Amino acid sequence: MDKLADLNYTLSVITSMNDTLHSIIEDPGMAYFPYIASVLTVLFALHKASIPTMKIALKTSKCSYKVIKYCIVTIINTLLKLVGYKEQVTTKDEIEQQMDRIVKEMRRQLEMIDKLTTREIEQVELLKRIHDNLITRPVDVIDMSKEFNQKNIKTLDEWESRKNPYEPSEVTASM
């Protein structure tokens, strides 16, 4: 562990990588050298980051299989992103979590649809009752005795003095 985090060790690995590259590629005009160097740099960075992380994770974790699987999936996804793929590798656990989330959302939507359907049925029943109450039924004879405005009205013939009591008459005032 100390050897992996040692700066001298890191510099010696980089120096040995550079020496190896220069010995393999003798021609200085090689066009692919920057690409090869960047890929090797990324691989070295992954090596330096993943080995200590996995060692610490395996020591502290109770379930080493899941940790190794997660680390490998993360490394593969990183490499796929570097190459330019948009797809990602997923584990069974992630797929099951997504399926559970989808099923939970579908249940929630079905409950909401059920509530809305129940409310709509209640509204339709209420509208039917209102419609039934508003339907006018033809009546042969209208009983006007229950009308308040028509109770005490007498015609001119029915008045005793044959004079309309509601017509204004002359008013005399005392002085």
Swiss-Prot record:
<dbReference type="GO" id="GO:0090729">
    <property type="term" value="F:toxin activity"/>
</dbReference>
<keyword id="KW-0812">Transmembrane</keyword>
<comment type="similarity">
    <text>Belongs to the rotavirus NSP4 family.</text>
</comment>
<keyword id="KW-1182">Viral ion channel</keyword>
<keyword id="KW-0800">Toxin</keyword>
<dbReference type="GO" id="GO:0044155">
    <property type="term" value="C:host caveola"/>
</dbReference>
<dbReference type="Pfam" id="PF01452">
    <property type="entry name" value="Rota_NSP4"/>
</dbReference>
<comment type="function">
    <text>Plays an essential role in the virus replication cycle by acting as a viroporin. Creates a pore in the host endoplasmic reticulum and as a consequence releases Ca(2+) in the cytoplasm of infected cell. In turn, high levels of cytoplasmic calcium trigger membrane trafficking and transport of viral ER-associated proteins to viroplasms, sites of viral genome replication and immature particle assembly.</text>
</comment>
<keyword id="KW-0260">Enterotoxin</keyword>
<keyword id="KW-1133">Transmembrane helix</keyword>
<feature type="topological domain" description="Cytoplasmic">
    <location>
        <begin position="52"/>
        <end position="175"/>
    </location>
</feature>
<feature type="binding site">
    <location>
        <position position="123"/>
    </location>
    <ligand>
        <name>Ca(2+)</name>
    </ligand>
</feature>
<dbReference type="GO" id="GO:0016032">
    <property type="term" value="P:viral process"/>
</dbReference>
<keyword id="KW-0406">Ion transport</keyword>
<keyword id="KW-1043">Host membrane</keyword>
<comment type="function">
    <text>The secreted form acts as an enterotoxin that causes phospholipase C-dependent elevation of the intracellular calcium concentration in host intestinal mucosa cells. Increased concentration of intracellular calcium disrupts the cytoskeleton and the tight junctions, raising the paracellular permeability. Potentiates chloride ion secretion through a calcium ion-dependent signaling pathway, inducing age-dependent diarrhea.</text>
</comment>
<dbReference type="GO" id="GO:0044169">
    <property type="term" value="C:host cell rough endoplasmic reticulum membrane"/>
</dbReference>
<keyword id="KW-0106">Calcium</keyword>
<dbReference type="InterPro" id="IPR002107">
    <property type="entry name" value="Rotavirus_NSP4"/>
</dbReference>
<comment type="subunit">
    <text>Homotetramer. Interacts with the immature particle in the viroplasm. Interacts with host CAV1, early and late in infection. Interacts with host integrin ITGA1/ITGB1 heterodimer. Interacts with host integrin ITGA2/ITGB1 heterodimer. Interaction with microtubules blocks trafficking to the Golgi apparatus.</text>
</comment>
<keyword id="KW-0472">Membrane</keyword>
<dbReference type="GO" id="GO:0016020">
    <property type="term" value="C:membrane"/>
</dbReference>
<keyword id="KW-0479">Metal-binding</keyword>
<protein>
    <recommendedName>
        <fullName>Non-structural glycoprotein 4</fullName>
    </recommendedName>
</protein>
<dbReference type="GO" id="GO:0005576">
    <property type="term" value="C:extracellular region"/>
</dbReference>
<keyword id="KW-1038">Host endoplasmic reticulum</keyword>
<feature type="glycosylation site" description="N-linked (GlcNAc...) asparagine; by host">
    <location>
        <position position="8"/>
    </location>
</feature>
<keyword id="KW-1072">Activation of host autophagy by virus</keyword>
<feature type="topological domain" description="Lumenal">
    <location>
        <begin position="1"/>
        <end position="28"/>
    </location>
</feature>
<keyword id="KW-0325">Glycoprotein</keyword>
<keyword id="KW-0813">Transport</keyword>
<dbReference type="GO" id="GO:0039520">
    <property type="term" value="P:symbiont-mediated activation of host autophagy"/>
</dbReference>
<dbReference type="GO" id="GO:0034220">
    <property type="term" value="P:monoatomic ion transmembrane transport"/>
</dbReference>
<keyword id="KW-0843">Virulence</keyword>
<feature type="binding site">
    <location>
        <position position="120"/>
    </location>
    <ligand>
        <name>Ca(2+)</name>
    </ligand>
</feature>
<dbReference type="GO" id="GO:0015267">
    <property type="term" value="F:channel activity"/>
</dbReference>
<keyword id="KW-0735">Signal-anchor</keyword>
<keyword id="KW-0407">Ion channel</keyword>
<feature type="glycosylation site" description="N-linked (GlcNAc...) asparagine; by host">
    <location>
        <position position="18"/>
    </location>
</feature>
<dbReference type="GO" id="GO:0046872">
    <property type="term" value="F:metal ion binding"/>
</dbReference>
<feature type="transmembrane region" description="Helical; Signal-anchor for type III membrane protein">
    <location>
        <begin position="29"/>
        <end position="51"/>
    </location>
</feature>
<keyword id="KW-0964">Secreted</keyword>
